[in-house]
């Protein structure tokens, strides 16, 4: 069954809704995580699209069709894979920097400080004029107007911002810039003759993906392809 999120992806691949309806979703449905966003539907739609593409490629290679099934709960967990990572059966520490997070600012507004990278942490602490201590940071942020703090941190080449409502975000220039972009864009970087796919017993056997992204969203997207 094609979900609303999956339907938005259909035109990108030239798929019909009937084709997308061949996907079999299972497991829990939203809300899975404590958020108003439909993360389960979105993540399962992305993995469903990858599965359909792999199935189509396999059919082109072999003439045989594959079924596509997605567990919504597992698809959601895949976006937080670092939380469940293990090394030799032992959990891998995923502790964030202690000053990273959301803090109350003036006038009932909130500010978010992204401090995982040393340069971003240094920029935020420099603007706030405090040491690396969560209580000290909280007291300092409480003295700031959230928007003014956002502008000061950005000017210091840090990362952070005022927490906005959906309506406020919709009026922001960055929101407009993102809304004008296609969901997916393929940029050809050079010309070459077509190459035959390597032999293998899976749809993408022998195909390699070079991931040049950094931080969170990019590597997560590459993991979905893997």
Residue ranges and their predicted role:
Residues 1-224:
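Acyl-CoA thioester-binding alpha/beta core of soluble enzymes
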């Amino acid at each position: 069954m094609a979900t609303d999120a999956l339907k938005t992806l259909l035109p990108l691949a030239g798929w019909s809704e009937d084709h997308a309806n061949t996907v079999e979703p299972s497991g829990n449905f939203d809300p899975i995580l404590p958020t108003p966003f439909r993360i389960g539907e979105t993540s399962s739609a992305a993995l469903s699209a990858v599965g359909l593409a792999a199935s189509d490629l396999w059919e082109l290679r072999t003439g045989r069709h594959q079924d596509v099934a997605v567990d919504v709960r597992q698809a959601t967990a895949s976006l937080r894979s670092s939380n469940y990572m293990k090394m030799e059966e032992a959990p891998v520490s995923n502790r964030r920097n202690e000053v990273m997070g959301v803090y109350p600012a003036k006038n009932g507004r909130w500010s978010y400080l992204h401090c995982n990278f040393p340069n971003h942490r240094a920029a935020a602490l420099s603007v706030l004029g405090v040491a690396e201590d969560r209580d000290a940071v909280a007291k300092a942020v409480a003295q700031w107007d959230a928007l003014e703090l956002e502008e000061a941190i950005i000017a210091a080449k840090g990362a952070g911002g005022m927490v906005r409502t959906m309506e406020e975000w919709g009026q922001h220039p960055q929101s407009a810039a993102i809304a004008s972009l296609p969901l997916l864009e393929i940029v050809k970087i050079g010309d070459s003759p077509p190459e035959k796919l390597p032999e293998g017993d899976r749809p993408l056997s022998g195909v390699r993906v070079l991931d040049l992204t950094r931080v969170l969203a990019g590597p997560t997207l590459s993991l979905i392809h893997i």
